[in-house]
A protein has these predicted regions:
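Short helix-loop junctions at transmembrane helix boundaries
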Residues: 286-287, 293-331
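Peri-transmembrane interface segments
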Residues: 213-256, 260-269, 273-274, 285-289, ...
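Basic-flanked hydrophobic alpha-helices used for secretion and membrane insertion
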Residues: 69, 94-98, 102-129, 134-232
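Alpha-helical transmembrane segments
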Residues: 14, 27-54
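Alpha-helical transmembrane segments of integral membrane proteins
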Residues: 18-28, 241-258, 295-299, 303, ...
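N-terminal Sec/SRP start-transfer signal
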Residues: 1-29, 231
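Membrane-proximal extracellular/periplasmic loop immediately following the first transmembrane helix
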Residues: 45-96, 106-111
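Short helix-to-coil transition segments within interhelical loops
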Residues: 8, 274-282
């Protein structure tokens, strides 16, 4: 190790090119991994944020929340289970616009009858449980579109006005930003088109473990990962993006392997001298491996550091998310 480090220290020009290459390759792979995770999270981030809860849906929905329809009798059946910390959820696509302004924004409304039991990453210390009727918590990506706390937005389907009271981080679902509203607000919005509408959740979320044996044949229960996998487009998108990352990682490793091989060929005469003075082939091999290890650790550390340093400067609208476990595997 000492000999390997001394050679690097006293002949840095010999190793500078390969070190730069390692840094660039590491930065590229880490950055692509972050984009891959980010693109995956814009499909399922809010479901992931809710944590390890269970979702009770109608069986014909096949695990897709917006496709679920719970009848009054099924809701009564669920109530009879006396589940702990249960929350009703409705997911609805829509568009909205700022009051007195033109142009519309796509949005996915998450309407719930209570916000006490689920995690929402509201900013500035806002407590989601305090959300009142005709108020809305928007995903932070809307900040870049000129929307601020205190603004009023109008749902274009119902013309209902909603006051923005907070922003939330990682509030994404199905390639769309999420807006959180109360069940009463959704009821008012839908009654504009259907006066007879009353609140009827698509899914019941509970922290209590529920099995299929606890439910009738018309109902099903899914965990967090099962719900995520059933979000339209998630599985295919995630598989393609992960494959791209691994292809780049393997290609980078192959390129670096070629450079290290060329570096070893350039040192054949040096190896001969070392053998002549009594150094074994095993010792020479350990020196080379130590050198590769030192160069790799330095390059990986710099590349990872650059990627992490860039994170705070990326626009909120860019889907970028780094995970420690992915960084460890790539490194």
């Amino acid at each position: 190790m000492k000999i390997a480090w001394n050679e690097i220290k006293y002949q840095p020009k010999k190793f500078i090119l390969i070190e730069i290459l390692i840094v660039i390759m590491m930065f590229m792979v880490i950055f692509l991994s972050g984009l891959t995770n980010g693109l995956g999270r814009i499909i399922m981030a809010q479901i992931d944020t809710f944590g390890d809860v269970h979702y009770i849906l109608s069986k014909d929905s096949e695990g897709v929340i917006p496709y679920s329809t719970l009848t009054s009798s099924e809701l009564t059946e669920i109530e009879d289970l006396h589940l702990e910390e249960q929350t009703g959820l409705v997911i609805q696509r829509s568009t909205f616009m700022k009051e007195d302004e033109e142009g519309s924004q796509d949005v996915t409304f998450f309407a719930m009858d209570t916000y006490k039991n689920l995690t929402i990453k509201a900013e500035d210390g806002y407590v989601a449980a305090n959300l009142s009727d005709n108020e809305v918590i928007l995903d932070e990506s809307y900040k870049a579109k000129g929307i601020h706390v205190g603004d009023t937005i109008k749902d274009k389907t119902s013309d209902i006005l909603l006051k923005v009271v907070a922003f939330a981080k990682d509030a994404k679902y199905g390639h769309s930003s999420v807006a959180f509203i109360s069940s009463k607000t959704l009821e008012e919005m839908r009654q504009k088109k259907n006066p007879n509408y009353t609140w009827q959740p698509q899914a019941i979320i509970t922290s209590q473990a529920v099995t299929a044996d606890d439910l009738s044949e018309q109902l099903m229960v899914s965990n967090k990962q099962q719900i995520i996998n059933k979000i339209p487009g998630y599985t295919a998108t995630n598989m393609i993006l992960k494959t791209m990352t691994w292809v780049l990682l393997i290609a980078s490793a192959a390129i670096l392997g070629v450079f290290f091989y060329i570096l070893a060929l350039q040192k054949l005469k040096q190896f001969g001298v070392l053998k002549a003075i009594g150094m074994s082939m095993g010792q020479i091999t350990r020196i080379q491996l130590s050198q590769v290890g030192i160069l790799s650790v330095i390059g990986i550390s710099i590349g990872l550091g650059l990627a992490m340093a860039l994170m705070p400067f990326l626009p909120v609208s860019m889907p970028f998310y780094m995970r420690a476990e992915d960084n460890a595997v790539i490194s």
